[in-house]
């Protein structure tokens, strides 16, 4: 597989604080990536650095094999839709789309027109007067119609209603199937997108926690539920990411591939094995460590 | 598509800020002066400085334009270099058009005998000696000089933020205080104004290298500017 993004020990510091610390990963061509994590985890900072809008403090960064900084060969293949994008005050929706059409080399006029209708955007309205959801729709239209080989969406649907969101997923998947490209998606609504994601990167407090195929990750995360003693003996020595107990019952969440033998053993001991959703998994992983300790003491 | 042209397109969508606003303001001021001239039947000569507004506006325009379009352009993955070149090209174009218009209005003023009411608005008395081509050149040079002066300041703000602005203006104030003190101390003020009175034409020429320096500084600053 062709690697279109290579990031090596990427770090971004603001004074003494590190927003991103020693992050290393690669992005392969033609897949949908999810960049997940809590607010302030460093997702947006990473995306800003990938698109050369921010400068790394240290580390290596290659996009399409080259440094993206002031490099049109790289930048012309990118489209970065961010929640914090600002527009000139006098611009109307129409102006933004006209400019985007002249700047993105692969711009699809028909698709843009179709999306405009789907999202019911008022063409003549000023960007300043748009609601949060409409503003997000403009970003989504640009992100999809630009057909950039690497499209990055950062919280693309803030303020969008459920109908518009499912419209976005539908259009994204449809267009992705017809025009394969690489998509990086950062979002809080993990459950909604978890089925689309092919690869998951989880960032917490500036560090990369998980870099795995979504399929593998889904098959690895389980909650084991049953009587305390049985659960404890079964999960001993395994990679535990969360535990809770109520009375004599205990539930432990594991992140580890279990072999069939393990599963049989669990069944024989009357333990229940429940696969957990990606959202739950990420909540467990990124809950602050101190909380985890409090839970242990209980 | 060429990305510098893309930047110019971004600016061109904002024709109001670039072209219409300064001209509407200045022509309005001209109209007021003209009405006064007509009401006084041209008995008193009016030497209006109204044409200065368009020059001050050029300085202000880039402050507004850069604050709004730089984050937008970078958001569309435009290179900083392309932004700089496209914006400068737009400024040269707008300055050229405005200078030609000012020049043409000055000519009309000359031929209509100061609009028939002794209103000297576009044809400035101190440029009487200058050839028409020289006058056109001066209009243009002063305008792009104003533009790039604003460009440097907005680029300092872009690159170093509010703190940078603060430091810059403190330094500027301290420096000009020292200069002004030295001038007073050595009794040079009169000589200074005498020199200006005799050499003001040279000042226009000096604006050319100054403008080049402003432009280079703006470029260097923008190359390291970020958006979030």
Each language-model region and where it sits:
Chain A
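Catalytic Walker B motif of ABC-type/P-loop ATPase nucleotide-binding domains
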Residues: 151-155, 160
């Amino acid at each position: 597989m062709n690697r279109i993004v290579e990031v090596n020990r990427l770090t971004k510091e603001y004074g003494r604080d590190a927003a991103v610390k020693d992050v290393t990963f690669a992005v392969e061509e033609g897949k949908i990536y999810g960049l997940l994590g809590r607010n302030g985890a460093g997702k947006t900072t990473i995306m800003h650095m990938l698109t050369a809008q921010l400068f790394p403090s240290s580390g290596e960064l290659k996009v399409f094999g080259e440094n993206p900084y002031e490099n049109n060969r790289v930048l012309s293949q990118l489209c970065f839709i961010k929640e914090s994008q600002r527009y000139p005050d006098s611009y109307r929706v129409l102006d933004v789309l006209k400019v985007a059409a002249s700047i993105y080399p692969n711009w699809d006029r028909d698709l843009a027109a179709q999306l405009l209708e789907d999202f019911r955007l008022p063409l003549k309205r000023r960007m300043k007067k748009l609601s949060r959801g409409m503003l997000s729709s403009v970003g989504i239209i640009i992100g999809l119609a630009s057909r950039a080989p690497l499209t990055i969406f950062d919280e693309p649907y803030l303020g969008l209603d459920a109908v518009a969101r499912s419209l976005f997923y539908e259009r994204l998947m449809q267009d992705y199937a017809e025009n394969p490209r690489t998509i990086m998606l950062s979002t809080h609504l993990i459950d909604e997108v978890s089925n689309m994601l092919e690869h998951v990167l989880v960032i917490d407090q500036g560090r990369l926690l998980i870099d795995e195929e979504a399929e593998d990750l889904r098959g690895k995360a389980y909650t084991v539920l049953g009587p305390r003693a049985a659960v404890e003996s079964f999960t001993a020595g395994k990679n535990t990411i969360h535990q809770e107990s109520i009375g004599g019952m205990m539930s432990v969440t594991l992140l580890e591939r279990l072999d069939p033998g393990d599963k049989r053993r669990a069944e024989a001991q009357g333990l229940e094995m429940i696969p957990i959703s990606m959202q739950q998994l990420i909540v467990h992983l990124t809950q602050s460590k101190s909380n985890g300790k409090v839970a242990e003491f209980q | 598509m060429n990305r510098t042209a893309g930047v110019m397109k971004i600016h061109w969508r904002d024709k109001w800020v670039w072209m219409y606003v300064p001209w509407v303001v200045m022509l309005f001021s001209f109209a007021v002066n003209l009405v006064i001239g007509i009401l006084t039947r041209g008995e008193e000569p009016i030497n209006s400085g109204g044409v200065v507004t368009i020059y001050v506006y050029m300085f202000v325009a880039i402050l507004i334009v850069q604050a709004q379009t730089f984050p937008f352009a970078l958001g569309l993955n435009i290179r900083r270099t392309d932004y700089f070149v496209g914006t400068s090209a737009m400024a040269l174009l707008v300055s050229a058009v405005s200078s030609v218009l000012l020049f043409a209005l000055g000519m009309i003023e000359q031929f209509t005998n100061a609009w028939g009411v002794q209103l000297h608005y576009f044809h400035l008395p101190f440029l009487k000696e200058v050839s028409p081509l020289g006058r056109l050149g001066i209009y243009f040079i002063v305008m792009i000089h104003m533009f790039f002066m604003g460009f440097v300041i907005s680029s300092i703000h872009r690159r170093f933020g509010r703190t940078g602005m603060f430091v810059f203006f403190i330094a500027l104030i301290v420096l000009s205080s020292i200069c002004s003190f030295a001038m007073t101390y050595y009794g040079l003020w009169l000589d200074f104004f005498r020199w200006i009175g005799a050499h003001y034409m040279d000042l226009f020429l000096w604006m050319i290298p100054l403008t080049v320096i402003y432009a280079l500084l703006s470029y260097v600053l923008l190359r390291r500017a970020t958006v979030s």
